[in-house]
């Protein structure tokens, strides 16, 4: 994973997400880990969603529940890598960065990629977050 295109706050959130996975004894981390980390880190995501009158508490609970249900194969190691779904999201975030005209991939680019139908979640799952 090349994080040179990522904002400093996203790099910090990725480190937090890795730490969550280690704590949960996972050898990979997923979308739910990163979203929870983006809410924990000062990325601006919470404030932007609040300004859009989204129920941030519900969104956090939804992703936290998914994190609790997360299963990774293998055993915990010091090398915790993004799973396949998160890798797709991070790739798709580059497209979001271009569309949003951002200088670097940040939490908004990532969250936009997560909510793009078919990248990770179905239309029905995404509707639950609206």
Residue ranges with predicted function:
Residues 1-130:
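Histone-fold recognition with a strong bias for associated Lys/Arg-rich disordered tails
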């Amino acid at each position: 994973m090349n994080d040179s295109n990522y904002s400093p706050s996203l790099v910090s959130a990725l480190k937090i997400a890795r730490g969550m996975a280690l704590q949960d004894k996972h050898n990979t981390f997923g979308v739910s880990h990163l979203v929870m980390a983006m809410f924990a880190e000062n990325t601006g995501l919470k404030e932007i969603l609040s300004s859009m009158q989204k129920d941030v508490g519900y969104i956090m609970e939804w992703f936290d529940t998914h994190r609790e249900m997360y299963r990774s194969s293998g055993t915990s190691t010091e090398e915790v890598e993004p799973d396949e779904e998160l890798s797709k999201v991070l790739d798709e975030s580059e497209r979001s960065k271009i569309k949003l005209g951002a200088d670097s991939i940040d939490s908004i680019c990532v969250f936009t990629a997560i909510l793009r139908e078919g990248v990770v979640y179905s239309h029905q799952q995404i509707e639950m977050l609206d």
